[in-house]
């Protein structure tokens, strides 16, 4: 199986600094995977050399030209290796985390994700519900566009089809372009031996399940559907718990709404995870109407992330406009902290939503950092005679 030996090349602790790629490869002659986090314009040259040496690649870099991605993914297919990325926030291969992620129990679910936080959220939920994963393969945010053609998604599907440890596969993505979606569905229905859940966050169509595919529009629902494939008794138990939590959350929200004054009409959300931001946007728009966002495809409601918020606004701080020449907000939360405090000062804001992404390679003490930010935002509002509700989604495990 293609990824069986991935951890082998990670067991040696390198204490040397290398001045060239050649010297690094000589030192790790049995390596079968490499991770790149370099400026996007330099990815093609280095990635080409690594792929030709039959190394799988995890590419955290953003700002990689589209034509370079197409070239490199075709080259990867020719050499029978994975090109995970660009903008791959997370992959978890044989329990080893690349990029951001958490320690997840081993299990029988394979995850394919176009985004890092999609893999993180689904894998941590599976762990919480008592299940685990075989691998989580990040394919990059553009892989499911028609011009890329789902090259690495289809390659990852091939890997899971031939993996005896994978019983079911979860694919997590924002909306998939039509040609690629149809290609994936046809391949599963006609050739797959495994069961699939396709989580298409924000999909406008109500798609009918088939014998091999269940469709979902939210990550939590998709995880529950995967669980049903594997253990129906556990599915029923967890579903009852989730329904109870939802009812308790509704009661809490109704209680907190009584604390807001008539001017506090708007919601603001500031996210480190793009999938979490997009999923929140979809849910909110079903409840309160259109939301301004740097993830919006509607020109009327699309705003630059560093522009002032308008009415109801959700911002993904992991977008390229924020990560050019600065660390990702999961690593450096300071920029987002300042924006939270700024918008909390707006007398028309009643609710702030944030995500807190914990785990490997995230900022140290991130929980305490964000707790202090939330506390300060609430105290500032209180000094001005207002109450402020802050909702934080924590993505992580206790491992």
Describe the residue ranges of each PLM region.
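Catalytic-core regions of core metabolic enzymes
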Residues: 1-399
């Amino acid at each position: 199986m293609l990824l069986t030996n991935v951890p082998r090349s990670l067991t040696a602790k390198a204490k040397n600094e290398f001045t060239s790629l050649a010297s690094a490869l000589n030192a790790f002659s049995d390596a079968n995977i490499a991770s790149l986090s370099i400026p996007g314009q330099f990815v093609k040259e280095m990635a080409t050399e690594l792929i030709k040496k039959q190394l799988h690649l995890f590419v955290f870099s953003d700002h990689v030209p589209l034509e370079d991605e197409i070239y490199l993914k075709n080259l990867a297919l020719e050499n029978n290796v994975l090109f995970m990325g660009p903008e791959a926030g997370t992959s978890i291969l044989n329990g080893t985390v690349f990029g951001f992620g958490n320690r997840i129990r081993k299990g029988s679910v394979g995850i394919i994700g176009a985004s890092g936080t999609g893999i993180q959220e689904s894998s941590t939920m599976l762990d919480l519900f008592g299940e685990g994963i075989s691998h989580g393969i990040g394919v990059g945010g553009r892989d499911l566009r028609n011009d890329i053609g789902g090259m690495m998604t289809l390659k990852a599907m091939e890997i899971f089809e031939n993996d005896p440890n994978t019983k079911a596969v979860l694919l997590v993505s924002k909306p998939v372009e039509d040609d690629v979606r149809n290609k994936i569905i046809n391949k599963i229905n006609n050739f797959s031996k495994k069961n699939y859940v396709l989580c298409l966050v924000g999909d406008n169509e109500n798609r009918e399940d088939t014998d091999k595919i269940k469709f979902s529009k939210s990550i939590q629902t998709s995880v529950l559907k995967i669980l049903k494939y594997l253990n129906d008794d556990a599915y029923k138990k967890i579903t009852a718990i989730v329904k109870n939590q939802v009812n308790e959350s509704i009661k809490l929200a109704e209680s907190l709404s009584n604390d807001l004054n008539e001017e506090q009409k708007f919601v603001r959300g500031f996210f480190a995870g793009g999938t979490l931001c997009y999923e929140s946007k979809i849910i909110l728009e079903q409840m309160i109407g259109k939301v301004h966002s740097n993830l919006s495809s509607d020109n009327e409601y699309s705003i630059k992330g560093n522009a002032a918020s308008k009415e109801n606004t959700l911002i993904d701080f992991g977008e390229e406009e924020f990560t050019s020449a600065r660390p990702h907000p999961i690593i450096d939360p300071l920029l987002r902290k300042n924006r939270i405090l700024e918008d909390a000062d707006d007398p028309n804001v009643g609710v702030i939503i944030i995500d807190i992404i914990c785990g490997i390679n995230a900022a140290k003490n991130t929980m305490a950092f964000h707790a202090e930010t939330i506390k300060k935002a609430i105290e500032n509002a209180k000094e001005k005679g207002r109450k402020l509700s802050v909702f934080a989604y924590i993505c992580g495990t206790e491992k």
